[in-house]
């Protein structure tokens, strides 16, 4: 079955596509700063379907440009990183981080050809341990998003990257689909095994009420179940344009994080997980009452393949379709790890990538639990069509400060307080 136009337009991100145009309005996380050694080898970088090369000069300046030399199309990945730019090893032409040809030793100076040659390049900034790229056309650049976690001291922020073999929207929707948590991640857990003061005891109630609304920057949801003494336990999360998810991994007072689901191309995504390391909140992988580890639940033990230099060679997980995502059927059979896959990131990876690189939305039978997914698709499509029709800027492009206040997490509130008011009361005064 052919994909619908909406389905296609939501996931295709190459230059000239509707979503590609919308994404290019924003600053995009491209790679970790540590991936670029000063004076070291260039890095192949696939971003929104464009083949780029990134490098760091000996002085520390970063450049991101088209991977092809404008002379004969040779790969600039093979080039020499020098002070002042990247030199093609074919004919010695050298390009600055601004894309100018600054040296052309194979052509006589009197021919005055050097100044007429440029390589396509993109503006870059570094923040929170990440190199950011702006791929749009504006002469006055937008500001970087002022997400709370990005404004903490860099030594208090951990950045995790992870590549997935599926489109960006599929991965984002996995983040905002909270109904899977009680099954995929903790389906083998019994509430009476969890410490009395740990919120995972509420996961025994596997069918919460879901409440969703649009926000200035995207959408948000609250998933609620009854708690003790006329209280409600709430898990609250956000989608923020264009590809950000703020998820409820800890108590809202301590949960300072953000995940970006950055399209490498139409069928591959790079996750950037920014996490505050100073959180004192109880972790999801807190030991059980017995002292035993929580079965199958870990947030940090991600196993990677060794990075290579090819276009898809960065931050690939060890588990993939070729080895059935390392599923352990015996572990699954005894029920302690519901999925048979160890680790939260690996579990999510298996589910999302097993759908295929681009799922046909026409084959889905969405349930009331999928309200956040439905509303988020509509929200994105609305912004996409307005941008496509008349260039209307999507949310947040020129409102960088608005990203600072949203917070995700879980919390208890009196049943008498409505969900929107309860959230506003809980985040009041929290932002660091």
From Swiss-Prot:
In which family does this protein belong, per the annotation?
Belongs to the bacterial ring-hydroxylating dioxygenase alpha subunit family.
Q: What is this protein called?
A: 3-chlorobenzoate-3,4-dioxygenase oxygenase subunit
Q: What class of enzyme is it?
A: oxidoreductase
Which intervals hold domain Rieske?
27-133
> What does the entry list as the binding residues for Fe cation?
180, 185
BP terms from Gene Ontology: catabolic process
Cofactor annotation? [2Fe-2S] cluster; Fe cation
**Bound cofactor: record note:** Binds 1 [2Fe-2S] cluster.
Residues the record lists as binding [2Fe-2S] cluster: 69, 71, 88, 91
Give a yes or no for keyword NAD in this entry: yes
Provide the assembly information: This dioxygenase system consists of two proteins: an oxygenase and an oxygenase reductase.
The protein's matches in InterPro entries, at most eight in alphabetical order, are given as: Cholesterol_7-desaturase (IPR050584), LigXa_C (IPR045623), Rieske_2Fe-2S (IPR017941), Rieske_2Fe-2S_sf (IPR036922), Ring-hydroxy_dOase_2Fe2S_BS (IPR015881)
| Iron recorded as keyword | yes
Gene Ontology molecular-function annotations: 2 iron, 2 sulfur cluster binding; dioxygenase activity; iron ion binding
For this protein, what is the EC number? 1.14.-.-
**Which Pfam families does the UniProt record give?**
LigXa_C, Rieske
CDD domains, sorted:
Rieske_RO_Alpha_PhDO_like
Top-level lineage group = Bacteria
State the UniProt keywords alphabetically.
2Fe-2S, Aromatic hydrocarbons catabolism, Dioxygenase, Iron, Iron-sulfur, Metal-binding, NAD, Oxidoreductase
């Amino acid at each position: 079955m052919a994909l619908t136009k909406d389905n296609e337009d939501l996931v295709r991100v190459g230059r000239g596509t509707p979503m590609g145009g919308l994404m290019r309005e924003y600053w995009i996380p491209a790679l970790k700063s540590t991936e670029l050694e000063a004076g070291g080898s260039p890095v192949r970088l696939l971003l929104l379907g464009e083949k780029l090369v990134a490098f760091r000069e000996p002085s520390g300046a970063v450049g991101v440009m088209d991977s092809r030399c404008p002379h004969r199309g040779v790969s600039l990945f093979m080039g020499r990183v020098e002070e002042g730019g990247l030199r093609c090893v074919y004919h010695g032409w050298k390009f600055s981080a601004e894309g100018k040809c600054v040296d052309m030793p194979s052509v006589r100076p009197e021919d005055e050809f050097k100044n007429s040659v440029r390589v396509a390049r993109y503006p870059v900034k570094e923040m929170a341990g990440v190199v950011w790229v702006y791929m749009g056309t504006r002469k006055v650049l937008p500001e970087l998003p002022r997400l709370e976690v990005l404004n903490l001291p860099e030594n208090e922020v951990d950045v995790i990257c992870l590549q997935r073999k599926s489109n960006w929207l599929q991965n984002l929707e996995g983040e905002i689909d909270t109904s899977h948590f009680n099954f995929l991640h903790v389906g083998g857990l019994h509430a009476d095994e969890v410490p009395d003061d740990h919120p995972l005891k509420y996961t025994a109630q596997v069918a919460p009420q879901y409440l969703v609304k649009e926000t200035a920057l995207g959408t948000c949801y609250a998933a609620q179940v009854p708690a003790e003494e006329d209280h409600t336990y709430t898990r609250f999360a956000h989608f923020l344009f264009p590809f950000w998810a703020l998820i409820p991994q800890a108590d809202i007072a301590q949960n300072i994080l953000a995940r970006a689901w950055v399209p490498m191309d139409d069928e591959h995504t790079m996750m950037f997980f920014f996490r505050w390391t100073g959180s004192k909140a109880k972790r999801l992988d807190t030991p059980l009452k017995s002292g035993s580890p929580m079965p199958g639940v870990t947030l940090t033990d991600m196993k990677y393949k060794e990075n290579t230099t090819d276009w898809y060679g960065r931050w690939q997980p060890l588990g993939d379709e070729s080895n059935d995502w390392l599923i352990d059927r015996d572990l699954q059979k005894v029920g302690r790890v519901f999925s048979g896959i160890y680790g939260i990131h690996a579990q999510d990876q298996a589910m999302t990538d097993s759908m295929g690189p681009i799922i046909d939305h026409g084959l889905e039978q969405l349930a009331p639990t999928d309200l956040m997914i439905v509303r988020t698709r509509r929200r994105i499509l609305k912004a996409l069509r307005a941008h496509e029709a008349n260039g209307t800027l999507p949310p947040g492009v020129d409102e960088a400060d608005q990203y600072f206040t949203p917070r995700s997490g879980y919390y208890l509130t009196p049943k008498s307080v409505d969900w929107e008011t309860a959230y506003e009361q809980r985040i009041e005064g929290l932002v660091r």
